């Protein structure tokens, strides 16, 4: 299985730090299961994760699930296994607390899904707005995005941590940020890309709406008033934001 771990890591385009992280987590997985994958061994491994914090468990589960899928795809495993996080964040918690989603900025097999998630999380955009984003809407000199909607224009500052993922997409051919043969993708495509990315990160409970809510919570924490936040979101009235300011 050690060779399988090395082959799996080599098959992914990872930074040096990510390679080390994957190797450490999968070597730990190998030691616990003894190189044999079955339901009992996986249950034992999952039980061993109880001592780690939620974010660390999610990272380890994500690495192991990707590895298990790799083994299944190659025919090494005859049965498909997938581990689930047992301690889920409840919907109520998600709506009231800012989540640690730093793993969204790490390597992924779903770069389009990651960019969609980060555009929602960092700028509060809706999937419909993302689908219509033109590369000309971005000014990379001043790091701003201009959006016109319903005769309302808003200027959004692009966060530094978003830029590396965004610039990569802006350098590709085409007028739209996301397009296929010159046409925007369907709503289902955006949904599927985001879902695949969230599943990879073991954040299956999240949706585009809840990611946008994370943007709202962060902006409120940063001192934005209800009126200022409504302008950032392109809302005609701040009424729908009242529940976050009670």
From Swiss-Prot:
Record's GO cellular component terms: cytoplasm
Q: Where is the active site?
A: 149, 212, 244 (o-(3'-phospho-dna)-tyrosine intermediate)
Q: Which Pfam families match?
A: Phage_integrase (PF00589)
Superkingdom of this protein's organism:
Bacteria
The record's subcellular locations are: Cytoplasm
Residue ranges of every copy of the Tyr recombinase domain listed in the record: 84-246
For this chain's UniProt record, which GO biological process terms are given?
DNA transposition
GO MF terms here are: DNA binding; tyrosine-based site-specific recombinase activity
Keyword annotations from UniProtKB, A to Z: Cytoplasm, DNA integration, DNA recombination, DNA-binding
Q: Which CDD domains match?
A: INT_StrepXerD_C_like
The UniProt family comment states: Belongs to the 'phage' integrase family. XerD-like subfamily.
Matches recorded under HAMAP family: Recomb_XerD_like (MF_01817)
Q: What does this protein do?
A: Putative tyrosine recombinase. Not involved in the cutting and rejoining of the recombining DNA molecules on dif(SL) site.
> What is the protein name given in its UniProt record?
Tyrosine recombinase XerD-like
